[in-house]
Regions:
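Acidic, proline/glycine-rich short linear motifs
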Residues: 1-21, 101-124, 167-196
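Structural alpha-helical scaffold elements that stabilize or flank donor/cofactor-binding regions
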Residues: 51-54, 83, 128, 229
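Protein-protein interaction modules outside structured cores
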Residues: 179, 188-196, 214, 224-228, ...
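Charged docking surfaces used in two-component/phosphorelay signaling
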Residues: 42-49, 217-224
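Glycine-rich, Arg-bearing micro-motifs that act as flexible, cationic patches
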Residues: 63-86, 100-107, 235-260
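A short helix-to-beta-strand connector/capping loop
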Residues: 29-39, 207-214
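Intrinsically disordered or low-complexity boundary/linker segments at protein termini
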Residues: 35, 59-60, 65, 81-147, ...
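Small/aliphatic-rich secondary-structure junction motif
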Residues: 1-10, 124-183, 235
Length: 270
């Protein structure tokens, strides 16, 4: 039952602080970290509102992604997706590997395979080991994506990782292409324009010494392309630009889809 006095609440907070301390000590084992820089806080509030309030002027908010199936994450939403949409600071969502998708995938495979012989689904093994995977940033030439690019550069520098800059484009993302003001540009012309946008971004960038940067433009919807890229990345960084409100829930903004379905850690930059 809920505590009914100030003394009871004080005891609850004390117990929570002890549990947090035990958890942190275990999680930080083997990490070069000064405990003096750590502050433990417990509040009685919904996760989203509490983290937004505590983290409103922080460098970033970091959370783990809840273990729901893909369908449940789309239908019910998640704390991490809500934070990524509402926060004014970068939100990093650490993917915690789980077996829920693998179990459902195996059930689907068995349901659709003729005969009675069971089908066993095995998660494909990554081509590149995690320690060598790049930081990937999705850009589109907008101011928000420029901030995402700057954030990704710093992440790559801190972790001594290569940075891969991706522009996943469709013709509507490219604006008016010279010579095609009243016509639909061919894909090869769009590809050339997308590569020009990437080149313009890189020309203005200040690349830290030692950071290896590569670029690619792909003719594919941003959410689909970046989720595919997440299978080969250690960290995926995107801007928050996209749909909002009812349309975002039913159609899905790029950032919401990536937070819910990416296969690596994701940061959404505002």
């Amino acid at each position: 039952s809920e505590p009914d006095s100030d003394e009871a609440w004080a005891k609850v907070r004390h117990d929570i602080a002890n549990e947090l301390r035990v958890w942190v000590d275990k999680a930080a084992a083997g990490i070069d970290f000064d405990p003096a820089n750590l502050k433990l806080t417990s509040v009685k509030a919904s996760g989203t509102s509490a983290l937004l309030q505590i983290g409103h002027d922080s460098q970033q908010i970091v959370v783990g992604r809840r273990s729901l199936s893909r369908m449940a994450r789309w239908f019910m939403g998640s704390l991490s997706a809500s934070l990524a949409e509402a926060a004014e600071v970068p939100v990093t969502v650490v993917r915690i590997a789980g077996s829920e998708d693998e179990t459902v995938t195996e059930a689907i495979a068995n349901a659709l395979t003729p005969g009675d012989k069971p089908v066993h689904y095995t998660q494909p093994q990554p081509v590149v080991e995690e320690a060598r995977r790049p930081v990937v940033v999705g850009v589109d030439g907008s101011e928000t994506s420029r901030r995402a690019f700057d954030f990704a550069l710093e992440e790559a520098r801190l972790h001594d990782a290569p940075l891969h800059v991706m522009f996943c484009w469709q013709l509507k993302d490219l604006g008016v292409i010279p010579g095609y003001e009243n016509a639909v540009a061919p894909v090869k012309v769009g590809q050339r324009r997308a590569e020009e946008i990437l080149s313009e971004l890189m020309a203005k960038a200040r690349i830290p010494d030692g950071v290896k940067v590569s670029t690619n433009a792909f003719h594919i919807p941003a959410s689909k392309g970046l989720i595919a890229a997440s299978r080969y990345a250690s960290h995926l960084v995107v801007g928050s630009r996209g749909l909002s409100g009812l349309d975002a829930h039913f159609l899905g903004s790029v950032s919401r889809q990536i937070v819910n379905f990416a296969e690596c850690t994701v940061t959404v930059v505002h």
